[in-house]
């Protein structure tokens, strides 16, 4: 199956802990990041804010050793299972997903929960 990148040349990557199955983060890869990930066995992404390649954990030491990569049924998203060497989130939390949304307080798609 062929990888389908978006107009900006990116593909979303859901990163999951291979042991606990917890979803750790959502990031994006371009072709170069995917190539580096496959070559090194460690997670590399494209930073949309900095507009540069990003080796996860290069400065913090919280690298992610890749166990496997799976392409979704449409070819436009990746699941990357990893063995993390530390927290995935820049806040120091294990996962970037730690902000629950209360459905009772949700007012619709234009509601800003801040």
Show where each model-derived region lies.
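C-terminal binding/interaction regions
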Residues: 2-10, 16-24, 29-114
């Amino acid at each position: 199956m062929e990888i389908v990148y978006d107009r900006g040349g990116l593909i979303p990557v859901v990163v999951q802990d291979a042991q606990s199955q917890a979803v750790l983060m959502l990031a994006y890869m371009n072709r170069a990041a995917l190539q580096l990930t496959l070559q090194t066995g460690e997670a590399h992404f494209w930073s949309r804010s900095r507009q540069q390649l990003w080796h996860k954990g290069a400065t913090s030491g919280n690298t992610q050793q890749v166990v496997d990569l799976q392409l979704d049924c449409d070819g436009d998203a990746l699941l990357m299972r990893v063995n993390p060497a530390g927290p995935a989130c820049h806040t120091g939390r294990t996962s970037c997903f730690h902000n629950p949304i209360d459905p009772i307080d949700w007012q619709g798609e234009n509601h800003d929960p801040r």
